Amino acid sequence: MEKLTDLNYTLSVITLMNDTLHTIMEDPGMAYFPYIASVLTVLFTLHKASLPTMKIALKTSRCSYKVIKYCIVSIFNTLLKLAGYKEQITTKDEIEKQMDRVVKEMRRQLEMIDKLTTREIEQVELLKRIYDMLIATSVDKIDTTQEFNQKHFKTLNEWAEGENPYKPREVTASL
């Protein structure tokens, strides 16, 4: 355990790896050497970091399968990011969470559409009732005998109530 946390040990292993790579590939024109060295360094670091982390996680956690799965997925996602990929590996739990979120949002939108549709139907019914109230009846049904000015055509005896409605009245106000 002391060697895992010892920085000098880790640095000496990295130096040893670099020296070994330099001796294997003595060609100074090797264009891929920095990439190979960085990949090996990342793999070594992941090896040194992941094993103790998994051991501690397994000892402290009660659901070891989920922790191991999460660690492995995290390691692969890190490797994919280092390789330049934008895609990531997701677990079934994350997919189920995303699906639940999508289904919940769809239900919310369906409820909103249902409310809006109900309101629109109510508005259409209200407009229909208003239209029915405002619709004009045909000319054949309207009694137009009282519509024209009867002052010139009827005499006092012919008025329906007995007096001319167009005759001005005298109004006296009390003081």
Curated annotation (Swiss-Prot):
It is a single-pass type III membrane protein. The N-glycosyl content is primarily Man(9)GlcNAc, with a small amount of Man(8)GlcNAc. Ca(2+) binds at residues 120, 123. The keyword Ribosomal protein does not apply. Keywords: Activation of host autophagy by virus, Calcium, Enterotoxin, Glycoprotein, Host endoplasmic reticulum, Host membrane, Host-virus interaction, Ion channel, Ion transport, Membrane, Metal-binding, Secreted, Signal-anchor, Toxin, Transmembrane, Transmembrane helix, Transport, Viral ion channel, Virulence. It is found in: Host rough endoplasmic reticulum membrane; Host membrane, Host caveola; Secreted. Glycans are attached at residues 8, 18. Residues 1-28 are lumenal. InterPro entries: Rotavirus_NSP4. One of its GO terms (cellular component) is host caveola. Homotetramer. Interacts with the immature particle in the viroplasm. Interacts with host CAV1, early and late in infection. Interacts with host integrin ITGA1/ITGB1 heterodimer. Interacts with host integrin ITGA2/ITGB1 heterodimer. Interaction with microtubules blocks trafficking to the Golgi apparatus. This is Non-structural glycoprotein 4. It comes from Rotavirus A (isolate RVA/Cat/Japan/FRV64/1989/G3P5B[3]).
